[in-house]
């Protein structure tokens, strides 16, 4: 029995000896010589690679960045509080790599690709090293597709193509990040993945960016890589390489990617910090000699691949922060020479309220024009020239008042162009809309619109063309040709006339233009228009008593001939308001709960017109003047007018001093359900005179501010923006446009019905702000001294 056991044991030993391999597992180990400021000197790692990950005894990792003869300089990628001299350091024989693929979409990660958004760990099937050689010359294709930013001035003057590197440069607080975020938001639905790399930013700033992207649904196709200001310099150094590595994976899959580096100035500072701590010799501005190579190898990885490699692209928007507008500093000049153009943000323009504050003179796009669609290229080509002429003459015009007509024309056009390219954040345009807006500049039509109304006119113009065959033709052709150009010229002239409600100054279209215009609109085109204006005469001036409950939402569907213009609708409303009735075809009125037809047989009884519905007990009684004519200047509905107390004018010097010398600032928490707020509104100088000098107590606005409101600060918009006074708010009354005018016209700061209708053109409701006591400042205050954010339709909420 014992012999059998021994025999079995010997057999097992022999079997193990046969399987023995002579290969030995080698483990390279070094020791910590010194450490400090996130840098560790290690000896004993003679075969370590550049950018290789090394691991310390406590599990913290570092990256070998300096390979010297007697030691290795390692930058730490984690907490080094527990590392001490003499600790062992192990090679891992792998380069820094991060997870890539669609699993990264919608995530916020650190410089090592680890999730920091509290949405769980990232489970990736593929990893990629962060340092790669950029695609070669023969692997690339020229830029030929536009990347739409949705920002009018950029798409028109400095277009960006897919695969381009376009620098955004300027001082702090000039709107650089806003442009980049708007560009990301505008990629929604365009099959473009986005990467936003935040380098050295505050955590609160990054959180705001993420919230803004989430609010616009942009995080669905975006990855945010963050190395905030409190992170180790090594993490700030590798963050942009992590971002472009994530982007490259999608590019090689044939997808288009937009990457934003915010910003490379802080990236260069982080690299300078590491280099000085590693005892590398400093150069200009203490930057190491290879700082140019640092950014060139990063930005060269953005490109457009040729079709054989999938035709994917990476478009890079690096951001550089300048000091006092100095673009000749070391890092700005380096990055300008690497990129394919720059967008220069100007502090003076930003402070003057020009947003985006782009300096057209110093900005340029060297390759993007090849990617512009033809319609934008046709209309945007003259934009830079018009602005250059305006800038040149603007300086000279300040030295004298005697200007010739040509100079006045150029200055007027230039001011209009500056207003045209103003654009609020997160309000992108598609390129067809941009082409239509730019057409008004190219054809010199925009100066007809007052500068202060151009922002409203742009929205009006786009709504004017919305859903028309003319716009569809432009979107299909992507160009202005001999057929649609005269039609657009005629249509825009009609739109301007309609917007200004000024038919006596209307410039009729030439015969050829009118013919081209008519070609795009035929008699069979049915347009559904909003019925609020058309049926004001029913709602306000006539007794309409249905037997069953009806909805307030009423629409009219009618056959119209040619192109239905808002001006024509407005004129129809005026006729109806003034009791001018003619024989009309039966119209179908569509209500939410009821449907009825106005009876075809209309009876006239003792000077009254009766319209009866046979299915419902509706009766509409309207007095008709025997002559058939009524004064067009004013409505005769005196019954609706209410008596509003005259506003009390405050004369007490002490009270005025107290009111005038308070400091107001905008507050995110200013609008609450409990605390009463102060709002700021803008009115014309004439309206301000009526309010403060003549004690008119009603100010009209298009929208209602958030409640509750106690005080209202007032600033005038011309000739200069000045805060001229304030008033205590009695109440806010909301009615339809006609009702508000009929009720408050005698107390209104707006003196004429024509001016009132111009202001409320295309709006359903008027909001009357009633003042109880007014306080006129003796020294008007500069609007720029108020720290504020713009609210809806001129409202600013203050504390």
UniProtKB/Swiss-Prot annotation:
Gene3D superfamilies: 2.40.30.20, ATP synthase alpha/beta chain, C-terminal domain, Hypothetical protein, P-loop containing nucleotide triphosphate hydrolases
Positions bound to ATP: 170-177
CDD domains: ATP-synt_F1_alpha_C, ATP-synt_F1_alpha_N, F1-ATPase_alpha_CD
Entry EC no(s): 7.1.2.2
Record site feature (Required for activity), residues: 363
Sequence segments annotated as region (ATP synthase alpha chain): 1-549
Membrane topology: Peripheral membrane protein
GO MF: ADP binding; ATP binding; proton-transporting ATP synthase activity, rotational mechanism
InterPro entries: ATP_synth_asu-like_sf (IPR023366), ATP_synth_asu_C (IPR000793), ATP_synth_asu_C_sf (IPR038376), ATP_synth_F1_a_nt-bd_dom (IPR033732), ATP_synth_F1_asu (IPR005294), ATPase_a/bsu_AS (IPR020003), ATPase_F1/V1/A1_a/bsu_N (IPR004100), ATPase_F1/V1/A1_a/bsu_N_sf (IPR036121)
SUPFAM superfamilies the record matches: C-terminal domain of alpha and beta subunits of F1 ATP synthase, N-terminal domain of alpha and beta subunits of F1 ATP synthase, P-loop containing nucleoside triphosphate hydrolases
Cell compartments where the protein resides: Cell membrane
Lineage: superkingdom: Bacteria
Residue numbers spanned by region Unknown: 550-799
PROSITE patterns: ATPASE_ALPHA_BETA
GO cellular component, one term: plasma membrane
Catalytically driven reaction(s): ATP + H2O + 4 H(+)(in) = ADP + phosphate + 5 H(+)(out)
Residues in the signal sequence: none
Pfam families according to UniProt: ATP-synt_ab, ATP-synt_ab_C, ATP-synt_ab_N
Alphabetical keyword list: ATP synthesis, ATP-binding, Cell membrane, CF(1), Hydrogen ion transport, Ion transport, Membrane, Nucleotide-binding, Translocase, Transport
Quaternary data: F-type ATPases have 2 components, CF(1) - the catalytic core - and CF(0) - the membrane proton channel. CF(1) has five subunits: alpha(3), beta(3), gamma(1), delta(1), epsilon(1). CF(0) has three main subunits: a(1), b(2) and c(9-12). The alpha and beta chains form an alternating ring which encloses part of the gamma chain. CF(1) is attached to CF(0) by a central stalk formed by the gamma and epsilon chains, while a peripheral stalk is formed by the delta and b chains.
Family, similarity comment: Belongs to the ATPase alpha/beta chains family.
HAMAP family from the UniProt entry: ATP_synth_alpha_bact
Function of the protein: Produces ATP from ADP in the presence of a proton gradient across the membrane. The alpha chain is a regulatory subunit.
Alphabetical list of NCBIfam families matching this protein: atpA, PRK13343.1
Name of the featured protein: ATP synthase subunit alpha
